[in-house]
Each structure stands twice: as C-alpha cells, then as structure tokens.
Design a protein with these regions (language model features):
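A short, N-terminal "cap"/entry segment at the start of jelly-roll beta-barrel domains
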Residues: 1-24, 40, 105-111
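Conserved short histidine dyad/triad with adjacent acidic residue
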Residues: 28-43
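Short, surface-exposed secondary-structure edge patches
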Residues: 29, 48, 64-65
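Glycine- and acidic-residue-biased ligand/ion/polar-headgroup-sensing regions
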Residues: 45-56, 61
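Ligand-binding loop in jelly-roll beta-barrel domains
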Residues: 78-103
Length: 111
C-alpha cells in the first residue's frame, strides 16, 4: 500500500488534535462546542481552515467577527492574531491545513 491513512476523533466534545506533522504540511482537527473557543493565538504559517460542521466565528487582529458556515474554506495569512469561537448553536468542526509546516516559518509576533 503506497498511501497512508490517518484517523481523527468523531466527537461533539472539545478536541484539538494533530493529524499530520510532515515536513511540507501540518494538518489539525478541531471540534468546539457551542459557546466555547479555541485559545487565542497567532497564525504560525499560511493557514487554511476547512469548516465541515457548524459555523466558525473568526476575528483577525482584534477586528470584528466574520462567520463562516460548513462548506467554507477560510485562508488566513501568516503572523496574524486569531480568535476562533463557536458562537452558534451547533457543534463546530473544522480542519486546519498549515503549509508550509510551521517548523519552517520564522518566529511569530507575541500576543
């Protein structure tokens, strides 16, 4: 078998899990219950968030929140402050694709 299969949690409970940490890409899986949030952080690479369930509420650089429903792919540039919340009534589930892998990027600003 030439391909590699990776698994991820199927849950409604909060989870942040690294699925792939390869030289060229980093892929994470995140589930956030209604009213909860991901810890505030700075994008440490070029980030693409693939929303598969619920609505992702995103504030960049302390701006107003934009809301991205399931079926959206949200691109976030390197080195921006990110606040990710689930402001909806449904569980939020999304995948984060970081390319290149953050290990190859320069240091990010401090928040």
């Amino acid at each position: 078998m030439l391909e590699t299969e990776y698994t991820y949690s199927r849950t409604d409970a909060f989870v942040m899990e690294k699925i792939i940490d390869a030289e060229y890409v980093n892929i994470n899986h995140i589930v956030v219950a209604p009213g909860e949030a991901v810890p505030t952080h700075v994008s440490n690479s070029w980030v693409h968030q693939i929303v598969v369930r619920g609505t992702l509420s995103l504030s960049l650089e302390d701006g107003e929140f934009n809301h991205h429903p399931a079926g959206s792919v949200v691109a976030v540039p390197f080195n921006l402050k990110m606040i990710i919340q689930n402001q909806g009534s449904e569980t939020l589930e999304f995948f984060v694709v970081k390319a290149p892998n953050p290990r190859t990027m320069s240091e990010t600003k401090k928040i």
